[in-house]
Structure formats: structure tokens, C-alpha cells
Amino acid sequence: SLRRRQRQMCIRDRKDTYPGFEGTFNYQQRMPIVDLPVSMDNLLSNVTAVVVTHTHLDHWDDTAIKSIPKSLPIFVQNTADKELIISQGFNDVRIIFESLEFNGITLRKTGGSHGTVEMYANPVLAPLAGDAMGVIFEAEGEPTVYLVGDTVWTSDVEKALLRFDPNVIIMNTGYAQILGFEDSIIMGTKDIGRMVVRKPEAKIIAVHMDTVNHTATSREDVRKFIKGNNIEIHVAVPEDGETITL
């Protein structure tokens, strides 16, 4: 149930199926770096819908396309992603324009930026970075969950924190990097520290590490950071396949 438990897991091909992303940090490393920690049947057994924040290979790949039942509701950010996923055989693809309801849960789209202003000014990199949404999950009597998505810290993130006041914040903190750019295309440890200061009453869940080649920050790095800053009570760093009860 989206209300009671949060499992953050992409359905990916077997370990080393794909070459690393060209032009990124550690590009020689094939990916996924790990296999799925649970069987596909177990993973999908209680899934009632899938949220695809964007369709980059590390979020939506051939195994996801082949394994997810084609009748399962898929929630996406825009028309382009909807058309792509329909072309892959799925027949219930819904765009979160602003918000929608599903099984007593309200899903609200939030904005972000999959890289810095400098990166989006690059005519080659900008279309590759593309768009990536975040999602707010709200349900009666349940904590409000903010899935930040693949973004750096932007005014859209600030607006979401102010507007929705989330109780649980899921942050992609692998600090994925493009060669030739000092900054990252997603968040990292400094953003965790910033979030703790910004929302000290929220539970932060740090994910999107140790599975794809271009993430420069590992779980070990994050754990060292939170321990060194005495913020263990605020931040959880789940293992692959771990389910966190909210």
C-alpha cells in the first residue's frame, strides 16, 4: 500500500546488462551494478500502480517493459512519456498534469531540474537531461510523502516543501555526474544536510545509490555524512529491496 509502506525500487535488467552512460562519471562500469534482490513475482505481487518520474534507462528499462502487466495503471509526467509507454504496449497510462486520485491517494506533480542551468544551456546535453517530475502522495490519516525525483535543489523543491509540508521526503542522493561539469544532475550529501535544516521534523529517506555507473556518492558516503553531522535520527539509508514502514 502506498499509504503504509514505501518501497523504492526500479525494475531493472540483470547485473551488467547495459554499458555505462556515455560521457558520465565512471562510464566504463556496466549497469545495473547489482541484481534485483527479490524475485520479479515477489516484487510485483502487491503492486497496484507504477509511477514513472521519467523514462531514462535507470528508471524505465526493458525488464520493466516486459515484466509489468500491461493493464497496470502507469502514472507519467507528460504527453511524450505517455505516448512512449503506450507504444510499448501499456493500455492505462495517465498523465499527472497537476494532481489525480487513485485508490484514495492523491498524487500531485512537483517540478524539478535534472541538472544545473549551465547543463541545460548546453544544446547537446539539454535534450538528454530532459524533464523529470517529483510526486507528492497524500491520503487521509497517513503521512504526506514527497518523492523528490531526479532533480537538483531548485525553487520548485522549495515550493513543494512550503506548499505540502511533507512528513516523509524521499531524496535521490547519488550525486550523478556528467564529465566536464563540476556539479551533479541529482542531489547529494549536502542536499541531505540542507533538507534536515529545512525540514527537521520530517523523515528523510536517501536512495538512488550503488546501482548505476554515474552516481559518485555511495550509501557508505551518505552514512558517514549523517553520522559525522549527528543527523542519524532524521535520515534512513535503505538497502536494496528493504521496505520502510512509514
Q: What is each of the regions a protein language model found here?
A:
Residues 1-11:
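Single conserved hydrophobic/aromatic residue that forms the stacking wall/gate
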Residues 12, 46-55, 75-78, 145-151, ...:
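Active-site neighborhood of phospho(di)ester-bond hydrolases with catalytic His/Asp-centered motifs
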Residues 15-29, 109-142:
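Active-site-proximal loop/helix segment associated with metal-binding centers of metalloenzymes
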Residues 16, 55-60, 82-84, 100-101, ...:
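Active-site environment of divalent metal-dependent phosphoester hydrolases
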Residues 23-76, 92, 165-170:
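Active-site metal-binding motif and surrounding structural segment of the metallo-beta-lactamase
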Residues 63-67, 84, 88-89, 156-160, ...:
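A short acidic, amphipathic alpha-helical/loop segment
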Residues 99-108, 138-145, 246:
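Beta-strand-turn-beta hairpins that frame and shape the catalytic cleft
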Residues 152-240:
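Cap/insert and terminal regions of metallo-dependent hydrolase folds
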